[in-house]
């Protein structure tokens, strides 16, 4: 009865793969797949390139990278090449009117003249009454105070220049931050109109001190990297060696290591059960019950009631029981999983070039991200600059008839205007053109292009690695039958025939990810809503989309393996992979969990080892090191430690992603091998002898005078 039921289940998920005498691993004679999707993808990329060209033609990222003076000219460029900093004549008017940081980021809307300077003022200075009658040249130019607006004549009196706001009336010790001169908080400002006390000024400047501190911190961080970059590279090299050794040694220690890890998980769960029981017993004796607490939104309060620890105890006990039952009844499948891990280690050892393919993926991902970032930046800064007339005090005599806020030419000479302080200032960028009106849509196009290209690059890496590892499994005589350049052959084959299939799978995943991003945006906007029903619905939607994304990633991964082997289109490959996995669902679950546990331990070993070594080295806690190996003196010794840990995690993830792809590929090949062959002379198994031994199978030995042909 059990065999009949199993046959019916197999029929529900398709028929087993039939024997094909012509099959010798990844098919070489194949044709292009999903051509329509390939054409759409190439057209989309062409449009993406056009968007980038348009953004480059119309965009001007200098407004983000460089500050502008009152006339809209860039500091540090062109005629102001030797004047990289921006000085505000009266920065307190900025502080009193708005947030200076937002003013600096959103344009020159600060109500005070601004001028490009070669260096920020270092000493405090205020115009004295006895200097009002002197000329600008005597007070400013000859005393190296080159802070007036361009074009102010030498013979103009100081009082006139101050009335027209052509020169500053005071200077404060300042330091550059964000390309602008900001004063320190401990300076004493002069008496200014509209400011009644120093507290207002101090409160305003305190908003700037974070930027200045950030500048100091950034300088120290740069110094630390300059001092420790060599040792960070050494730490990353150690991470690379550890990752490689861990994978290569799995063929020797996979079995004992998996057993130790499983026993370790059992031990952790057992300790958790013991701890929960002790907490439950103490609270039970105290009589602390949830009925006394009632309902509360303070989750930490539930730690003080016995029901919480009882529920945790039950959950951990159930998990412990499930794991024990799996260890008892699924030990055969665990042995198969261990054997596949050993086989994957051998495959990686035979094709060491696969371990460095993540570098190719990383470079391609970096190109995609950099292209999107530059395109988005240029699009955001597209538009023609707009200039308007502006005066600090429009009620001054002579300003009544001046058309304030009307368009003007910044090159016009306004010094002799009857309105004091009248200037043609930069207002912003025009949004009237076709490109400017379409910026939002083009940005959406760019985001879609970012997700699609990133997913396509990841799909390319998975399919290429699958093709290389499949050629290893289906080589009957190893290593003689393995192709000479399996990775390069798989790369060329994938690009030539299956660009469309990869684009199809990447597009499906992209649409789900875009939906998740939109949902996260809606959730962020509705975060203030207190309706519990709405929050619950939103949480359910987010959970469903997260599960859908995980499932599609899993399905795509196995579909790419089938594409690499058989050269079918995406839908057929996804269907065949899904049916094959469902016919062996228990083996799939066991292998997946064993592999996840092993790779998690591997990452923990590599990252933890590099982290511990980095900590003891950079903190100077390793005695006896020679002069050449002495740790550098750092401002923040944790900075290279965290950098080393992050780099080690990235390296370990790259290496173990290759190993994980190898395991998945060999597993699908193993399942097909079981269905396709029977061990006879005509249909021998391709799996290793250890797998044959675990399964209780063997290949029929050929006669002495014959050699098996494959």
From Swiss-Prot:
Keywords: Antiport, Cell membrane, Deafness, Disease variant, Glycoprotein, Membrane, Non-syndromic deafness, Transmembrane, Transmembrane helix, Transport. GO terms for biological process: acetylcholine biosynthetic process; acetylcholine secretion; choline transport; neuromast hair cell development; otolith formation; phosphatidylcholine biosynthetic process; positive regulation of cell growth; thiamine pyrophosphate transmembrane transport. Highly expressed in colon, also detected in prostate, trachea and lung. Isoform 3 is also expressed in colon but a lower levels. Glycans are attached at residues 69, 155, 197, 298, 393, 405, 416. It is found in: Membrane; Apical cell membrane. N-glycosylated; N-glycosylation of Asn-69, Asn-155 and Asn-393 is required for a proper thiamine pyrophosphate uptake. It is a multi-pass membrane protein. The chain crosses the membrane at residues 35-55, 230-250, 253-273, 310-330, 359-379, 456-476, 502-522, 561-581, 598-618, 639-659. It catalyses: choline(out) + n H(+)(in) = choline(in) + n H(+)(out); thiamine diphosphate(out) = thiamine diphosphate(in). Changing residue 411 to M: In a colorectal cancer sample; somatic mutation. This is Choline transporter-like protein 4. It comes from Homo sapiens (Human). The lineage of its organism: Eukaryota, Metazoa, Chordata, Craniata, Vertebrata.
